[in-house]
């Protein structure tokens, strides 16, 4: 049994959109930064920005070709590094379809969190890693291997995101509705464990809504200019004219990353879930809301304020947004939030369904969208069985809602009764990575 | 029910000790006993109902996959044939028990994540059950607070792995 009382554990929640990391026992993560990474292939760039870079220059003969390619990449991690444009820098995500597909990127993200953000020595702190509810056994073992072999942590535990969210609200049983950046996942938690077979997931998350808004604005002729792409010229005292700056070596992925940052802020500032299903006629004459872009342009946004968030409830709306045609095949199989909730509960044992309906927990950054809670509750009351007493719960504090997974991990790793649960380094050395399945069920 | 073969156990133990595998695999340590005392009940009493960091299973058993009782602790529930069949079905087709719950002697457990065709885990309040499938048997461990799920898993699955390595 690992004696973890001496030093604070580190809690890491690597989501598809942002990574949250910090000390157990605290009420918010100390580090929050993008989960995407900038990568420049194969060149030795003459960058002075040494603090934010890491060069994986150690090639080995045994590596595969793609690994050799990866080892020549120059990687840039963190908000500060990502805010600086570089020629030929692609923006990559370590996570695909909710599962890690590039462990080298994960490794760099962890290293950034430990060394650059928290400034800790991982050999001194037990690590609590949050993981998606449908994480595979291989993924868990790979994470354990990396933690023990590379970072040489003294102990490790892996806990599922919805369990941690449930824990953060003091509940052993709940239905967690996690509207994150990359996806939306509904998970029943019973007595502190995910009921695996009833987990329901959809690729519609905050980033998808941002893309809907971006395409909608572009279809109206609005140009979203990242800061690096324009300069302002004073043509008359107090009057400025915006001129596009041509930087041909900027990658499309980096341009999109920057545009998403801007449009994501628009979305967070003005979007509001409509009380009833959106339709164009009802919203054609509503007053507009103003938003000033970085280039000085002022947008007047009307129907999109309500249309875009309603995608969470009526995914077919996506078909009406110009530029979103590439999702035409995917959208028909995606269900709205209330249906996902009912689908998940219906896959659970009949004896606990009533309890789940009365403890629906909202989590994730996208769940903080205005009126989402009220709309979900209303739709569920209308469509759920008559015997169900629907109650949708959400922290009034947006920080708590956004970081509920991390906060649950912070609480869990601080508990005295949790200390006997750590998967210790000596257990790893004796039994190997597969032991994680037994230690962290 | 097959008898524990002392000879094959000794051979298996020796071969394990000389294994060249870079990563040592877990195995229950078998105390040396006279041949006449070696029995399935010993596995239950000494290796399942043993002390784990001050905690102990509340009940344990080794059943044949046909439902026959090879050995069990005193308070292990009387399982019904349909309950065993449900467990075997869930090993074959994971997910069949989740909508109905896992029953042991009439007690209902909610099914949580296990390992396909290898482990079924159930939860009931602060306690629960772990069932490990071996070549011929099913190893059961039932626990309650303050024993943790991980501790129950270790005891049950370690013994199960040992039986599998012994061909049982």
From Swiss-Prot, chain A:
Record's note on what induces expression: Before cytokinesis.
Alphabetical keyword list: Chromatin regulator, Cytoplasm, Developmental protein, Nucleus
InterPro entries documented for this protein: Actin, ATPase_NBD
GO molecular function: structural constituent of cytoskeleton
Location within or outside the cell: Nucleus; Cytoplasm
Biological process according to GO: chromatin organization; long-day photoperiodism, flowering; pollen sperm cell differentiation
Subunit structure: Component of the SWR1 chromatin-remodeling complex and of the NuA4 histone acetyltransferase complex. Interacts with the SWI/SNF complex. Interacts with EAF1A and EAF1B.
Function as written in the Swiss-Prot or TrEMBL entry: Involved in several developmental processes including organization of plant organs, flowering time, anther development, flower senescence and fertility, probably by regulating the chromatin structure.
Name of protein: Actin-related protein 4
Protein source organism: Arabidopsis thaliana
Swiss-Prot record, chain B:
Main subcellular localisation: cytoplasm
GO cellular component: cell cortex; cytoskeleton
Stated induction or repression of this protein's expression: Induced by hydrogen sulfide. Down-regulated by treatment with the flagellin peptide flg22 elicitor.
UniProt keyword Cytoplasm, yes or no: yes
GO MF entry, a single one: actin monomer binding
GO biological process terms, semicolon-separated: defense response
Record's keyword terms, sorted: Actin-binding, Cytoplasm, Cytoskeleton, Plant defense
Disruption of the gene: reported phenotype: Slight elongation of leaf petioles. Increased length of primary roots in seedlings.
Alphabetical list of Pfam families matching this protein: Profilin
Known tissue expression: Expressed in roots, rosette leaves, cauline leaves, stems and flowers.
Keyword Cytoplasm listed: yes
Highest rank taxon of the organism: Eukaryota
Protein family: Belongs to the profilin family.
Biological role: Binds to actin monomers and regulates the organization of the actin cytoskeleton. Can increase the critical concentration (Cc) of actin assembly in vitro. Acts as a downstream effector of the hydrogen sulfide signaling to regulate the assembly and depolymerization of F-actin. At high concentrations, profilin prevents the polymerization of actin, whereas it enhances it at low concentrations. Binding to the poly-proline motif of formin induces oligomerization of PRF3.
Subunit-level organization: Occurs in many kinds of cells as a complex with monomeric actin in a 1:1 ratio. Binding to the poly-proline motif of formins induces formation of oligomers through the N-terminal hydrophobic residues of PRF3.
Note: Plants overexpressing PRF3 exhibit a dwarf phenotype with delayed seed germination, reduced lengths of roots and hypocotyls, and inhibition of hypocotyl cell elongation due to F-actin rearrangement.
Descriptive protein name: Profilin-3
Species in which this protein is naturally found: Arabidopsis thaliana (Mouse-ear cress)
């Amino acid at each position: 049994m690992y004696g973890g009382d001496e030093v604070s554990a580190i809690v890491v929640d690597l989501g598809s959109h942002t990574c949250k990391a910090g000390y157990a026992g605290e009420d918010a993560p100390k580090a929050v930064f993008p989960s995407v990474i900038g990568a420049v292939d194969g060149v030795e760039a003459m960058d002075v920005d040494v603090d934010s870079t890491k060069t994986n220059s150690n090639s080995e003969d045994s590596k595969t070709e793609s690994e050799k390619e990866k080892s020549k990449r120059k990687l840039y991690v963190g908000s500060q590094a990502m805010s600086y444009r570089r020629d030929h820098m692609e923006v990559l995500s370590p996570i695909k379809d909710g599962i890690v597909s590039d462990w080298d990127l994960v490794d760099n993200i962890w290293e950034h969190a430990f060394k650059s953000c928290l400034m800790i020595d991982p050999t001194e702190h037990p690590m609590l890693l949050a993981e998606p509810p449908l994480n595979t056994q291989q993924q868990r073992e790979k994470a354990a291997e990396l933690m023990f072999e590379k970072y040489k942590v003294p102990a490790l535990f892996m806990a599922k995101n919805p369990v941690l969210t449930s824990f953060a609200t003091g509940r052993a049983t709940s239905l967690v509705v996690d509207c994150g950046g990359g996806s939306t996942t509904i998970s029943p938690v019973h007595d502190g464990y995910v009921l695996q077979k009833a987990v329901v997931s959809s690729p519609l998350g905050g980033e998808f809504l941002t893309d809907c808004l971006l395409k909608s604005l572009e279809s109206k002729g609005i140009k979203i200019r990242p800061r690096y792409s324009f300069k302002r010229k004073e043509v008359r005292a107090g009057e400025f004219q915006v001129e596009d700056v041509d930087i041909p070596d900027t990658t499309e992925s980096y341009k999109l990353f920057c545009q998403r940052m801007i449009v994501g802020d628009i979305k967070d500032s003005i979007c509001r879930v409509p009380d009833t299903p959106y339709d164009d006629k009802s919203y054609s004459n509503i007053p507009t809301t103003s938003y000033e872009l970085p280039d000085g342009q002022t947008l007047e946004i009307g129907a999109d304020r309500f249309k875009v968030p309603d995608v969470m409830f009526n995914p077919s709306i996506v078909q009406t947004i110009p530029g979103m045609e590439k999702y035409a095949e995917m959208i028909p199989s995606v269900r709205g939030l209330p249906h996902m909730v009912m689908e998940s509960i219906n896959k659970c044992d009949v004896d606990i369904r009533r309890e789940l309906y009365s403890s629906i927990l909202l989590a994730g950054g996208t769940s903080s969208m205005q009126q989402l809670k009220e709309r979900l509750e209303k739709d569920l009351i209308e469509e759920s069985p008559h015997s169900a007493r629907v109650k949708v719960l959400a922290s009034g504090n947006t920080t708590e809602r956004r970081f509920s997974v991390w906060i649950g991990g912070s609480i869990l790793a601080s508990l005295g009764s949790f200390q006997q649960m750590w998967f210790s380094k000596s257990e790893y050395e004796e039994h190997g990575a597969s032991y994680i399945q037994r230690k962290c069920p | 029910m097959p008898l524990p073969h002392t000879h094959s156990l000794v051979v298996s133990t020796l071969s394990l000790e000389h294994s060249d595998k870079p990563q040592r695999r877990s195995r229950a340590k078998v105390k040396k006993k006279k041949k006449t005392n070696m029995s399935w009940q010993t596995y239950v009493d000494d290796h399942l109902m043993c002390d784990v960091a001050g905690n102990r299973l509340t009940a344990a058993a080794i059943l044949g996959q046909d439902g026959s009782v090879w050995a069990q602790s005193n308070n292990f529930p009387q399982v019904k044939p349909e309950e065993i069949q449900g467990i075997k079905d869930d090993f074959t087709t994971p997910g069949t028990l989740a909508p109905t719950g896992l029953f042991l002697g009439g007690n209902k457990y909610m099914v949580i994540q296990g390992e396909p065709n290898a482990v079924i885990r159930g939860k009931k309040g602060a306690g629960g059950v772990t069932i490990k499938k071996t070549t011929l048997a099913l190893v059961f461990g039932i626990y309650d607070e303050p024993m943790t799920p991980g501790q129950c898993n270790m005891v049950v699955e370690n013994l199960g792995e040992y039986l599998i390595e012994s061909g049982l």
